[in-house]
Each structure stands twice: as structure tokens, then as C-alpha cells.
Amino acid sequence: NGLQWDLSENWLSPSSGLASWTYYYTNLDDGLTYTVKSRATDIAGNVQTSLGSDSFIYDVTAPTAGSVADGLTNEDQEWSSNLTTMSAIWTGFSDALSGLASYEYSIGTQAGGTQAASWTNVAMDTSMIDSSLTLSSGLQYFVNIRAIDQAGNASSAASSNGVNTDNIPPEVTAAFDGSAITDQDFQQDSTSMIVGWAATDSRELSYYSASLGT
């Protein structure tokens, strides 16, 4: 079990002349270190006294999932007009036994989905940006992250809270100068001007901006 070597264990002999072989053993305990030892016997019957040895940790426990945020800053991204690019950062993934080996991401129209991008390995990076996407305006997309440990176990997928895509610009439906509700062609005040407008958007308006010129 890695802590001691029991000399009463039975030695297993492969077929004569094999340099490597496979033995399937199913009664292993998760988290324990196991040691495999080997010895050679020559044609004269002499047995190797200095044993070959190698150890491994039996690990079938998946890593612990963390959290994912859309965008590359500490402020989570909620909206995007870019239909080819998505990005995300993540923290909090861990593995107590063999340790983390890599991360993978996918992008979908639902948490855990792969509709926009299949699972892609990003080594040990804790951020991603994919500029090869074909997204649709008016949908919500989620970035999903899973961790892979040194033994090949995958964590459950952690998902962002989603980015809403919208590349349809708002429409100004009316604009008024000289009054907030009706358009005026002349005014006497030379120090200020009242401007009014109305606008619509297929999703949600964020803010207005106005300029004045000749």
C-alpha cells in the first residue's frame, strides 16, 4: 500500500521473454500510494536482488469545481455586440490528491452546453478568449469550465451566468430641438437649448448621448 512492502506477496510471472506486460487489479483504494516492484530471473535461475520499483497514487476522485465570470476583468460581462468572440476568467478549482493538470472550456446556449464551442484544453491557464465563434444575436451564451487532474478525472462543469448578445443598434424614433416634446425652428434664448428625443431597442437601452453643433 506504499507504506510497507509485504514479502509474502505472490510474485506474478509473465510469459517467457516478455519485456512488458499488463496485469489488471480492481481492488484498489482511492487515495493510497501503491508500489510496483519487479525482478528478473536468468536462464541459470539467478534472481535479481536489487529490485526495480515504481509507485503511483490511485486517484478516482474528481477535482472540485470553482466559479466562472464572463469577460477578462473583475466586473462580470452581461452584454456583448461581438458575435465572434467570448472570454472568461475562473478561480477556485482544486484537487487534493494528484493535483490539477489542465482546464477545458466549452461555450453553449445553456449552462454546460457545447452548442457554440466544444470542449477545448487550455493547459493551466485561468482565462480564455475564443475569437473563432459564430454566435447569434439575441441569445444568451454561457462559458463552461472543467478541471482535469493528473489522473485524468474531470470535475463537474462550472458555468458563467451568461452573456447576452445584441448587435442590432438602437433606433432614434424622434428628436426635438427647442422643446422636449415638439420640434421648434426658432428660439430667442442664446445661452441654452432644450433637446428631446425618443428611441427604441430590440433588447435594452443602456444610455443616451447628445451633441450640439452648427
Where do the PLM segments sit?
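Structural beta-strand segments of beta-rich domains
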Residues: T84-A88, T191-V195
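Acidic, Ser/Thr
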Residues: I89-L97, G196-S202
